[in-house]
Amino acid sequence: MTTQAQTNLSDYLTKRMPKRETRAVWLTTLASLDWPKNYARSEESIKLQKQELIDILDKYQKANINTVLLQARVRAATIYPSDIEPWDQCITGVEGRAPGYGYDPLGFAVEECHKRGMEIHAWIATIPVGAKNSLGCRTLMKKGFRIRNFSTGSYLDPADPGVAPYLASICGEIVRKYDVDGINLDYIRYPDGWPRPSYRDGDTPDQRRSNITAIVRAIHDEVKAIKPWVKMSCSPIGKHADLSRYSSKNFNAHDRVSQEAQEWMRLGLMDQLYPMQYFRGDNYYPFVADWVENAYKREIVTGLGTYFLDPREGNWTLGDLTRQMYVSRDLGVGHAHFRSYFLTANKQGVYDFEKQFNATLSLPHKMQGVVSTAAMPYAVNSSLVERRADKSVILRWKAVTPYYNIYASYTYPVDTEDARNLLFTRYTGQTLQLKNVNPNLYFAVRGMDRYGLETPALQENMKSSTLSKSPATLLANDGNTLTLPTAAKLTDADRYVILSLQGVILRIVNAKSVRNNQLYIGSLSDGMYSLKVYNHKKKSFTLGAFMVKRGS
């Protein structure tokens, strides 16, 4: 990441981070593009494939990614034991071959994502079915589906009345078998090479849009009948239609490929859209605003062309991408990287930027139009928190709720609307032990239901807390400058580092620029921070925490 990008980001991170924001990655299994390269052919190779996936997910977690879009149906083939379609070759290297030994790649991925507090959505490639001689395509032809072949591969005919219930059955199978958080429909449209409407036998633009919408509706109805909390989404072409001042240049969702995605939002057939906005300049910004303006109070997550950072794919600079991320966040829009490899390989420093851009944890947006089913947690003992002499704390609570979000702050009561106070998301236990905890840290817990709706917060009981008897030890400041503690003079200071509560670096200050033991903090927004000092031997010392509160 360039020095200028780091400076711009540092300035940006002093702002309050969004508590609700989808931060997603598409993990492509097609041809193992993002999927582990070790084939699962033995117990040992299964372990290697699992470890590769764990390493990928660990990188997501370190960057505070909260949503994984995992390609579960590839090209009429799957990455799980399906009763409907054959195995994809990305798992074992051979199409139709099961890995054996009880290994279920999708089941494993669901478990590992949830361990990390991340949602996992099953990405379904709908209309493409691969090469005409592939096992998946041949299987569909034997079942009597109409298949059309182009230079780019073979495709289901969206006008075939059997397509909608068939694709719905696949999505239904996944939702029944797995605790996925969403179904993400890809290529839910007419293929690029499909002939223009003939206006014969009902082949009109309106009828084509109706054909695609019928497939979407069938999948929606099947999924919601099984688990109504599973999010329905799709990835439409990045430009919905021509705008009054900006042309889509003859490639848009509504008119070119028969995707009326904004209408699906209006009808409630989609909870989210991930438009594939792999464009720059006037081909991006007016169109992301158009998606937001026509979201009908549902969620938009902009699909980023991260792969263009690789010179073999395009000529984008990191600045091209980061500007889109800044603007989308200001519009209240989440972001999704296409693809995983280009993010985790840190092309042009994009992974480093992602980690800093996501300075705090965040929750995916809650589902609209539902009533909360979560029960507020309550303390097991007199207080939520038990503090021990070894500086560890144990949080204990009870409730009948699938998830809990854990918050912490140096102020009481803990502000659970501030993302900077989020410590854990989608936690599934009812006991949490933490070691080496600052004695001035307060805690709170909120339950969360399957729809993402939170309960009121359970705060710790101050009457029974040792905190109420402890003197404040926060570093003194007036909102503009912070007085460095005496200990700072003893450290051979080289630089001071200001961090968020979660440990993300927000500011690095050269010690030579500090005058009269006063550290400038005027550009920080109100909130809680910690301060470290590094000496010339690069050894670090924690100087303490401080609160910026300037008043109204």
Residue locations for each model-derived region?
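Pro/Thr/Ser/Gly-rich low-complexity, intrinsically disordered linker/stalk tracts
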Residues: Q356-T401, G452-T466
